[in-house]
Regions:
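Metal-dependent nucleotidyl/phosphoryl-transfer cores and adjacent nucleic-acid-binding surfaces
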Residues: 1-179
Length: 179
């Protein structure tokens, strides 16, 4: 539903509203020889990318699997590689800033379970805690979330789902790029 790309040495974000626009951009000749990194891409992103490649291109990618998970995907004709950074950075993305001394960066909170098509353009109160995966968080993380959420609600913060999603994605990509 939304994607962000950044070049390794350039923090400028390239924004895409769907997989088609992202892949059309990525498959341009200027990206030959590039590597595309996604943290935990094996679990979601690479499945969508591979589906696009098979449905909309003539390429037959080389794929390395671990079970049903895509560890690496290569379009040989373009020398374009899709690599899951979890293969060599076996930690949660939220730990990257501290691990790599990027003190100005922090992975924020996002209501992943609220991120469905009918809510893409929602504006209103900060969504309920349940949409943030509250029940699957560590006690420490849950405490941080509650503190953040209560502060947002107390100030009548207007949640703009699309703007928040964009900001969250840019932050994630920036954390990965700079790490």
């Amino acid at each position: 539903n939304f994607g962000i790309a950044q070049y390794q040495d350039d923090p400028t974000s390239h924004e895409f509203l769907d997989i088609n626009s992202f892949m059309e951009w990525l498959l341009l000749d200027e990206h030959k020889g590039y590597s595309v990194l996604a943290h935990n891409g094996r679990g979601y992103d690479f499945q969508i990318i591979m589906e696009y490649i098979y449905k909309h291109t003539i390429y037959k990618p080389f794929v390395v699997y671990a079970g049903s998970k895509i560890m690496i995907l290569v379009i040989k004709e373009l020398k374009l590689r899709f690599v899951d950074s979890l293969n060599f950075l076996a930690m949660r993305l939220e730990t990257f800033p501290k691990t790599f001394g990027l003190t100005e960066l922090k992975k924020g909170f996002f209501p992943h379970f609220f991120n469905v098509e009918e809510n893409y353009y929602y504006k209103g109160k900060v969504p309920s805690l349940r949409y943030f995966g509250y029940n699957s968080m560590s006690v420490k993380k849950r405490t941080e979330l509650i503190k953040w959420w209560v502060a947002k609600r107390a100030t009548n913060y207007e949640w703009d789902q699309f703007a928040e999603m964009k900001s969250y994605c840019i932050s994630d990509v920036d954390i990965l790029r700079r790490s």
